[in-house]
UniProtKB/Swiss-Prot annotation:
Pfam families membership: DUF3694, FHA, KIF1B, Kinesin, Kinesin_assoc, PH
Binding of ATP, residues: G97, Q98, T99, G100, A101, G102, K103, S104
Modified positions (Phosphothreonine) in chain numbering: T647, T652, T1075
PROSITE patterns referenced in this protein's UniProt entry, alphabetically: FHA_DOMAIN, KINESIN_MOTOR_1, KINESIN_MOTOR_2, PH_DOMAIN
GO process terms (BP): anterograde synaptic vesicle transport; apoptotic process; apoptotic process involved in development; mitochondrion transport along microtubule; neuromuscular synaptic transmission; neuron-neuron synaptic transmission; retrograde neuronal dense core vesicle transport; vesicle-mediated transport
Record's protein name: Kinesin-like protein KIF1B
Family: Belongs to the TRAFAC class myosin-kinesin ATPase superfamily. Kinesin family. Unc-104 subfamily.
Gene (UniProt): KIF1B
Effect of S1527N: Confers susceptibility to pheochromocytoma; found as germline mutation in a pheochromocytoma family; loss of ability to induce apoptosis
Disease per UniProt entry: Charcot-Marie-Tooth disease, axonal, type 2A1: A dominant axonal form of Charcot-Marie-Tooth disease, a disorder of the peripheral nervous system, characterized by progressive weakness and atrophy, initially of the peroneal muscles and later of the distal muscles of the arms. Charcot-Marie-Tooth disease is classified in two main groups on the basis of electrophysiologic properties and histopathology: primary peripheral demyelinating neuropathies (designated CMT1 when they are dominantly inherited) and primary peripheral axonal neuropathies (CMT2).
Compartments where located: Cytoplasm, Cytoskeleton
Sequence segments annotated as region (Interaction with KIFBP): 270-350
Record text on subunit structure and interactions: Monomer. Interacts with KIFBP; positively regulates KIF1B microtubule motor activity. Interacts (via C-terminus end of the kinesin-motor domain) with CHP1; the interaction occurs in a calcium-dependent manner.
Length: 1816
């Protein structure tokens, strides 16, 4: 029967009086063995269910069929436990629950026989079974002990001699036991009942004297049940000993629920310590049992804390040991006790998982005899089964065996103590009392007490005391003597000892004044019939009426035992005087006994709640309180009997006269009303709080006024000084020398460029109008309009020409006032109901918003009519909707940026912008009759009119129905552009051009043929599908072109100056691109010369040699444009048609017939032929040389919402999809507590930048006294992330290490403060939450020593973190499964020469485990990282990447600065009624500008591709004989700037402009006539690159011994250009050959580099220190700046979140200049950073390289120089390092990951080599 689980039963009691008075509700439900509890605070929450062995419903009355009585509880639990006891097992029953839950009632019950508890019934049945035994061989003995555990002290309740606290000892064989605990022999149930009563009396007396209650102490009643059996065959006696432990645990109440204070609170803490330890033991045992099946090996964590409390120490065998254990959990059904009841249920649920390994406690000899008998029986059965039963009785072997067996058993009996000791040594902790009893039969075991004399014992003690450790030895000797003396006692001696103790106990009680029965005993329940007496009352019902004191005739004195005169009733405790009071019992004349109470002087005596100082006559039932703790009820039997006879109907008290009644009566009579006292105290606290709050508010208001006055004074000073400075500047400007023409040109160029930037203005528009957008969306959602509004940026290009209504009024001017394509902020209106998209201007949005508000106000009145109309129409009198498009634009091709955009916009505006009178609408009107079979209507008209009527279409213009715009049925699919330069020669060309949408998406392809023809030539026969029109005559007027400024210079890239590039803002404004005055001069000169090309006949003179005879001025010329096919158009568009026109024409375009688009992949065959006749003019020649024809493709939208009956979209608008993933939220710094509030200083120019690599560690205190870094879980696999796995309740420290490159500007001075706060269980920060901010104590801050050659700085500081000071439950408890705790940490660090501290902020993720839990990384992590990093503290850290910028303070007096700092309120945060319905939708912000910039760059690239394709097609047709001038005008994309290594399109365009301006003769492309000059140029560039490679390479890497031809760098490289902007030739060989760390000649350009270009990447960590940095030869800002200027630096630290996209990862070999060996490291490229690890198993970032500031170099000469293949170099400002890949392919992949443009350039160069020289 070993391995059985603990039996667990729960029992719910009825409501008590307190719960009934509070009208409590029952929250416990039971069904079978399942128990459920309902949370009264959250009734909707599902009930928590628990399953136990027994669930007893005792909440109702016994009449309930489900009611569980005392007998049922005993029959289920008590009988089973008693049966186990007779079998020889140890048995334990303990009750648990809060105070008043019914534990004692279940265990002890009441005096009524039907309500007896488990203990009385078990004891009674025990003796019934003993008495019913008829086996003469069996004999029984029962011994009991009764002890109390209070505040970790043990008291003997049965022996009055043991007045002190007993010691708990542990014996190697017996285990834990209580020294000197009385073990009394009993022979009947009456003896046990008397001993229980005696123990309760002793417990009551002690508790009353010490102001205790039984509910605050643990009581353990132990019965040692011994069964002896005499075996007649062997003449041996065997024993089975069972120990029955009956435990009544203390209440598990919480301090706040019982109102405990002071001493009571301390006592409760000690009691809860025992219960807490018991809970730990139960949890540990349950966990061990659960893990047994998984792993049989005992772990170090399988420690059971038995010794943490006396209770668990003594009950060790009963909890998971050699015992059969049952637990009864008592529950309160009331909702006010929900927390305690739930805790009890969880306690019991854990207990049922414990398994006990119980064994039968019998002697080894008895076990051996039994096993031998079983073996003999088995052998006899076997012989009989084999047919040899007749020889069993006569076989001599068997007789000999039997004889030898008996002999052996006798020998074992004589020496059984040896076998016993050997057996117990093999099985420690399972020693039985019966086995110890067998020790007495051995002579050797008795020698210590009987055969050894006193002298020998004394000599032994002296010898032991003289040796080291003698005291311990003598203690163990005495302990053994006591045990042996106890075991040697016979049964008769034990009975005599029990009787003597009983006499002493009763004498002691009698001496104390406790009443004596007629038989002389004080025990048992009795009530005197005549004598007046006092009965004690106690808070514990079991202690009430337990003590009875007689009031004898005459005087009965009450006082302390040490009084001068003997006291009849002895009391002790606080406030009891030596002579406290006197009871006088006198008989009156009538024979009635009158008892009078006379209090002594200064004694506290109360009668019925009133303090008495004079004699008082007592009546039966009076309550008497002596001192503070002794409460009695006076009983006068005769007086009570007489009163009942006089008044039979006397009223009985409405409630029992108990201890609670007496205490409440005392408070009432003393005038103490607890409720009033609490209310009075609460009012006092409220008054005090209001007073202090008023004082604080007054002080705060006074301080605010003081600060405001100071700020106003300072502001006046600043304004006065700024005004004076501006006046001085103006005066100085007037006195300056007048500008020269060149200076005016430079100023004009700069002003035009500055004027073209719009970033700030666009942002102001987005911020300022966000509130209108939000309000429009909110009204749309509330009115269920299914219309969404969002910001969009539109640029006036040929892809998306803007109609006049979207242009602001100030932009509608001539081209001279607006020379650049402008970007406007518009509103994208998505009509989800009609499937249309419109674009409104901001003014139109505001106008419509007024109408929306009016409609919203009239929504109730229009509800009925609007509902009908909205179901039958798709448009109507609704400001939300514009007319939707039936044909949609698919795509378009790129175009130039001149004013033609505006002309094209006026001629053929995009359908999405078109008005009701647009050309596209007219086209739809013309084709309406032909498409009547397709649809009945050509337009969707307003709701209030008939379809297609003029009235309905004019509603908006007339103002009757201003809510709808008419939209065409055809939607623009896209645009394509075809150039006509082949007409110059003439040669026919067939173009396949991309159809590109306004967003830059390719929507299909269009095949167009352009050729020159004779005037009378007929169109070819294309088949039945041909659609042919006649010859159209078009004029190209020179005057018109001049007025319209359609010049070739304005439309060609070669003639554009820098400011005429398309710029939103920041484009072309890169800090790395600096245009020196010489370059500007050249550009302006070229621009001025080009601007005169149209004057006179310069155009024709310049191109006269290249134009054929067919293009003579004034002659007629005819050419043909054939629209062949369209392919790749999405099937959602039907009825596709195409129209085309010239850029300058405003009349009707040339259009094809619509074709059905079945979407099967077959091209749409238009085969539309259009002959065009023109008169040749200079404008026409210029047009065909530089300008295209625009083709617009339109389509019909198949999935029309009328066919789908509208879209039922009731969800709020969602945020639009972005082009890049949104950045992770970054927490704001935690405010400092010791520093003054830092103002957000306006930052000026950044002087230098540093990349910081920061390590965060949390260390915990280990048992060794050292702080070890806590384990970090890196399973997420992303950089700069990790979860700290911490222990609960352990001291911690936070360590932060900052790593960066050395720099003279950056020096950490001190750590001003480290603050932590924002404790939460989710990553997002709740700004509204009020959280305590904790400032940590900095214990160390210092620089760490690194290697001698290290160019990195390591700064580390450490702080003490006590998480309990946060007073946060999240930090104090064990984190539930699946939950994580987040905390924000901010470090304020002081830097030299900075006016304010720098702030490093990090969000830390943590999980808390129990204090004793063994934490290790997850299994998958260990298998992934291996043993090297899963166990090393080196991996227990979380990294962070930061960018530190040291900036100047901004110039407050500059008007430009004041303009840029103008305060534009971000209205997106303003509340709008109904915005809560938008479900997270937000207006677009600054990111929209960047996305639009990307769109423009994408369109620019598409445009360049189309132009290049046309140029290559024409060159192929002409056989590479295309003139140079035409290549200049048509193909700037093939100039040297195309292969530049610049990273943005703007810098590419700038480079192209510079190259064409400086060396216009060198950008001629691949003309066969210039091969020789090209070869010479290549030779010159190769010489330059060779000189750069050999002369400027770092001296640390190699020493160059070869000689190179002497050529000056100034003669080759462009002067004053930024080194990062290299020419075509240099980019081909060494794109970044001017890297500062690898070029010695970089000093020529240092002063021209911006500070942003000087920022660099941080170096790796100390773990691979060989990653050194080579300092650059550069003058730092510290040396260049003045002292006062340098002190004005402001640090700005921004956390960088690495990208989750991995470009490449793998191993690379690193070599530093100062090291001779190569080091292998694992590298991961997450642009723009390169992360360096020690290996692929390393979870911690050891170093980073910022690719945005680093330069990558590669050349074959470099590899030959270092004599190592597959190498390339990476250099930053302070470092240069060589990297080696595995092979050529791997190196090429790494180069592509590091610098894609460089890799592409190298591939392009190598592909042009001959195959014999190709390496790839």
């Amino acid at each position: 029967m070993s391995g059985a689980s603990v039996k667990v039963a729960v029992r719910v009691r009825p409501f008590n009086s307190r719960e009934t008075s509070k009208e409590s509700k029952c929250i416990i439900q039971m069904q079978g063995n399942s128990t459920s509890i309902i949370n009264p605070k959250n009734p909707k929450e599902a009930p928590k269910s628990f399953s136990f062995d027994y669930s007893y419903w005792s909440h109702t009355s016994p009449e309930d069929p489900c009611f569980a009585s005392q007998n049922r509880v005993y029959n289920d639990i008590g009988k089973e436990m008693l049966l186990h006891a007779f079998e020889g097992y140890n048995v334990c029953i303990f009750a648990y629950g809060q105070t008043g839950a019914g534990k004692s009632y279940t265990m002890m019950g009441k005096q009524e026989e039907s309500q007896a508890g488990i203990i009385p019934q078990l004891c009674e049945e025990l003796f019934e079974k003993i008495n019913d035994n008829c086996n003469e061989e069996m004999s029984y003995s029962v011994e009991v002990s009764y002890m109390e555990i209070y505040c970790e002290r043990v008291r003997d309740l049965l022996n009055p001699k043991n007045k002190g606290n007993l010691r708990v000892r542990e014996h190697p064989l017996l285990g834990p036991y209580v020294e000197d605990l009385s073990k009394l022999a009993v022979t009947s149930y009456t003896d046990i009942a008397d001993l229980m009563d005696a123990g309760n009396k002793a417990r009551t007396v002690a508790a009353t004297n010490m102001n205790e209650t039984s509910s605050r102490s643990h009581a353990v009643f132990t019965i040692v049940f011994t069964q002896k059996k005499h075996d007649n065959e062997t003449n041996l006696s065997t024993e089975k000993v069972s120990k029955i432990s009956l435990v009544d645990l203390a209440g598990s109440e919480r301090a706040d629920s019982t109102g405990a204070k002071g001493t009571r609170l301390k006592e409760g803490a000690n009691i809860n310590k025992s219960l807490t330890t018991l809970g730990k033991v139960i949890s540990a045992l349950a966990e061990v049992d659960n893990c047994t099946s998984k792993s049989k090996k005992k772990k170090k964590t399988d420690f059971i804390p038995y010794r943490d409390s006396v209770l668990t120490w003594l009950l060790r065998e009963n909890l998971g040991g050699n015992s059969r254990t049952a637990m009864v959990a008592a529950l309160s059904p009331a909702d006010i006790n929900y927390d305690e009841t739930l805790s009890t249920l969880r306690y019991a649920d854990r207990a049922k998982q414990i398994k006990c390994n119980a064994v039968i406690n019998e002697d080894p000899n008895a076990k051996l005899v039994r096993e031998l008998k079983e073996e003999v029986t088995r052998l006899k059965d076997l012989l009989r089964a084999q047919g040899l039963g007749d020889i069993i009785d006569i076989d001599p072997l068997i007789d000999d065996y039997s004889g030898s067996g008996s002999k052996y058993l006798k020998d074992f009996q004589n020496n059984k103590h040896r076998y016993l000791l050997a057996s117990e040594n093999q099985r420690p902790g399972h020693f039985s009392t019966a086995s110890m009893g067998s020790l007495t039969s051995s002579p050797s075991s008795c020698s210590l007490s009987s055969q050894v004399g006193l002298t020998s014992v004394t000599s032994i003690q002296e010898r032991i005391m003289s040796t080291p450790g003698g005291e311990e030895a003598i203690e163990r000797l005495k302990e053994s003597e006591k045990i042996i003396a106890e075991l040697n006692e016979t049964w008769e001696e034990k009975l005599r000892k029990t009787e003597a103790i009983r006499m002493e106990r009763e004498a002691l009680l009698a001496e104390m004044g406790v009443a004596i029965r007629e038989d002389g005993g004080t025990l048992g329940v009795f009530s005197p019939k005549k004598t007046p007496h006092l009965v004690n009352l106690n808070e514990d019902p079991l202690m009430s009426e337990c003590l009875l004191y007689y009031i004898k005739d005459g005087i009965t004195r009450v006082g302390q035992a040490d009084a001068e005169r003997r006291q009849d009733i002895v009391l002790s405790g606080a406030h009891i005087k030596e002579e406290h009071c006197i009871f006088r019992s006198e008989r009156s004349n009538s024979g009635e006994v009158i008892v009078t109470l006379e209090p002594c002087e200064r004694s506290e005596t109360y009668v019925n709640g009133k303090r008495v100082s004079q004699p008082v006559q007592l009546r039966s039932g009076n309550r008497i309180i002596m001192g503070k703790n002794h409460v009695f009820r006076f009983n006068h039997p005769e007086q009570a009997r007489a009163e009942r006879e006089k008044t039979p109907s006397a009223e009985t008290p409405s409630e029992p006269v108990d201890w609670t009644f007496a205490q409440r009566e005392l408070l009432e009579k003393q005038g103490i009303d607890m409720k009033q006292e609490m209310e009075k105290r609460l009012q006092e606290m409220e008054i005090l709080y209001k007073k202090e709050k008023e004082e604080a508010d007054l002080l705060l208001e006074q301080q605010r006024l003081d600060y405001e006055s100071k700020l106003q004074a300072l502001q006046k000073q600043v304004e006065t000084r700024s005004l004076a400075a501006e006046t001085t500047e103006e005066e100085e400007e007037e006195e300056e020398v007048p500008w020269t023409q060149h200076e005016f040109e430079l100023a004009q160029w700069a002003f035009r460029k500055w004027k073209s930037h719009q970033f700030t203005s666009l942002r102001d528009l987005l911020w300022g109008n966000a509130v209108y957008l939000k309000e429009a969306n909110a009204i749309s959602v509330e009115l269920k309009k299914k219309v969404q509004f969002q910001f969009v940026l539109l640029t006036d290009t040929l892809y998306s020409p803007l109609p006049p209504e979207l242009l602001p009024t100030e932009m509608e001017k001539t081209h001279e006032d607006r020379p650049f394509p402008r970007t406007v902020v518009a509103v994208e209106v998505q009509d989800l109901k009609n499937g249309a998209t419109h674009y409104w201007s901001l003014e139109k949005l505001k106008q419509r918003l007024d109408l929306m508000r009016e409609m919203y106000d009239r929504a109730g009145e229009m509800a009925s009519s609007a509902q009908d109309e909205s179901e039958t129409t798709v448009t109507g009198s609704d400001p939300f909707y514009d007319r939707f498009h039936w044909f949609k634009l698919v795509g378009s091709s790129p175009i130039f940026h001149g004013c033609v955009n505006e002309r094209l916009a006026d001629r053929t505006p995009s359908p999405t912008f078109s008005t009701a009178d647009s050309d596209i609408t007219e086209l739809a009107d013309e084709q309406q009759d032909e498409m009547e079979d397709f649809d009945d209507e050509a337009f969707v008209d307003d709701a209030g009119s008939d379809a297609g009527t003029e009235e309905g279409s004019d509603l908006f213009s007339d103002g009757h129905d201003p809510f709808y715009d008419r939209s065409p049925w055809f939607i623009l699919v896209g645009r394509a552009f075809v150039y006509l330069s082949n007409l110059l020669y003439p040669v026919p060309l067939i173009h396949r051009v991309a159809i590109v949408s306004e967003k830059g998406e390719v929507r299909g392809f269009l095949r167009v043929a352009v050729q020159a023809i004779a005037a009378d030539e007929e169109a070819p026969d294309y088949g039945s599908g041909i659609r042919q029109s006649g010859t159209a005559k078009i004029s190209f007027d020179n005057e018109y072109f001049n007025q319209s400024d359609f010049s070739s210079v304005a439309m060609t890239r070669s003639g554009l100056s820098l400011e005429e590039l398309r710029i939103v803002e920041g484009q072309g404004q890169s800090s790395e691109v600096i245009t020196p005055p010489e370059e500007i001069s050249r550009i302006n000169d070229l621009d001025l010369k080009s601007s005169t090309l149209l004057d006179g006949k310069m155009v024709m003179e310049g191109f006269s040699e290249e134009i054929g005879n067919h293009l003579k001025l004034g002659s007629a010329f005819t050419f043909r444009v054939t629209v062949l096919q369209a392919s790749g158009i999405l099937p959602e568009y039907a009825d596709i048609f195409c129209q085309f026109n010239f850029l300058h024409r405003h009349d009707e375009a040339f259009s094809t017939e619509p074709l059905k688009n079945n979407g099967r992949g077959s091209p749409l065959a238009f085969y539309h032929v259009q002959n065009i006749a023109v008169e040749i003019t200079e404008s026409f020649v210029d047009y065909i040389k530089t300008k295209p024809i625009v083709f617009e493709v339109f389509g019909h939208y198949q999935q029309h919402p009328l066919h789908l009956q509208g879209q039922e979209l009731n969800s709020p608008p969602q945020p639009c999809r972005r082009f890049f993933p949104p950045p992770m939220p970054l927490s704001k710094p935690v405010p400092a507590t010791k520093l003054n509030t830092m103002s957000k200083t306006s930052l000026g120019q950044s002087m230098s930048k540093y990349d910081l690599l920061v390590w965060f560690e949390i260390s915990e205190l280990e048992p060794t006294g050292e702080y070890i870094p806590a384990v970090v879980d890196h399973t997420a696999g992303l950089p700069c992330q990790g979860t700290f796995l911490l222990h609960q309740g352990i001291q911690r420290r936070i360590t932060v290490t900052i790593i960066h490159e050395k720099g003279s500007e950056l020096h950490w001075k001190d750590v001003r403060e480290l603050v932590v706060g924002r404790i939460r269980n989710k990553p997002e920060v709740d700004e509204a939450a009020v959280d305590a901010i904790l400032s940590l104590n900095i214990i160390s801050a210092k620089y760490l020593k690194s290697s001698h050659n290290s160019s990195r700085t390591f700064y580390r500081f450490e702080a003490v973190w006590d998480s309990s000071l946060h007073n946060s439950l999240l930090l104090n408890r064990v984190t539930p499964y699946g939950e994580k705790i987040y905390m924000t940490l901010s470090a304020y660090l002081e830097l030299d020469h900075c006016i304010q501290p720098a702030v490093i902020t990090k969000d830390v993720c943590m999980v808390f485990y129990s204090r004793d839990a063994k934490i290790s990384p997850p299994r998958s992590l260990r298998s992934l990282f291996g043993s090297g990093y899963s166990k090393s503290p080196d991996s227990n850290r979380v990294t962070g990447i930061y960018e530190l910028s040291l900036c100047k303070m901004s110039d407050t007096g500059s008007p430009g600065m004041q303009r840029r700092r103008r305060k534009i309120l971000d209205t997106s945060v303003a509340y709008v009624r109904g915005e809560e319905n938008l479900a997270g939708w937000r207006p677009r912000g600054d990111s929209l500008i960047l996305e639009h910039q990307w769109e423009l760059e994408k369109l620019e690239l598409l445009h360049e591709v189309e132009k290049t394709r046309h140029f290559l097609l024409l060159r192929e047709r002409l056989g590479d004989s295309i003139p140079k001038s035409l290549s200049d005008s048509l193909s700037p994309s093939l100039s040297s700037g195309t292969l530049s290594t610049s990273t943005s399109i703007s810098s590419q365009i700038s480079t192209t402009t510079f190259e064409s301006a400086i060396t216009p003769s060198e950008s001629s492309g691949y003309d066969s006539g210039d091969i020789e000059s090209l070869v010479d140029r290549e030779k010159e560039l190769a010489t330059k690159c060779l000189q750069l490679l050999t002369h400027t390479f770092n001296r640390e890497f190699s020493q160059v011994h070869g000689s190179v031809s002497d050529c000056k760098l100034s003669d080759i490289s462009p002067i004053g250009r930024d080194p990062s902007e290299s020419s075509f030739s240099s980019a081909t060989l060494t794109p970044s050959s001017t890297c500062p760390s690898l070029v010695d000649s970089r000093s020529n350009s240092l002063d021209q580099k911006t500070p942003e270009a000087n920022s660099r990447a941080s170096s790796p960590c100390p773990e691979f220190e060989q990653f050194q940095i080579v300092p650059a030869v550069e003058t730092p800002y510290l040396a260049r700046a003045g002292k006062n200027e340098f002190l004005n630096l402001v640090p700005d630290i921004e956390e960088i979140r690495p990208s989750s996209v991995v470009s490449k990862k793998g191993y690379l070999h690193f070599k530093e200049p100062l090291y001779s060996n190569w080091a292998k490291h694992f590298v991961v490229v997450r642009r723009p950073y390169v992360f360096i690890y020690n290996s692929d198993k390393d979870p911690v970032e050891r170093g980073i390289i910022n690719l945005s500031t680093a330069q990558v170099e590669y050349s074959e000469d470099q590899q030959a120089m270092v004599k190592t293949p597959n190498t390339f170099a990476v250099c930053t400002k302070h470092r240069g390092v060589l990297l080696q890949a595995l092979n050529d392919k791997d190196m090429n992949d790494w180069l592509y990951a590091f610098n894609p443009l460089l890799a592409g350039t190298i591939r392009s160069k190598l592909s042009r080599r001959c195959p014999s020289q190709s390496k790839y």
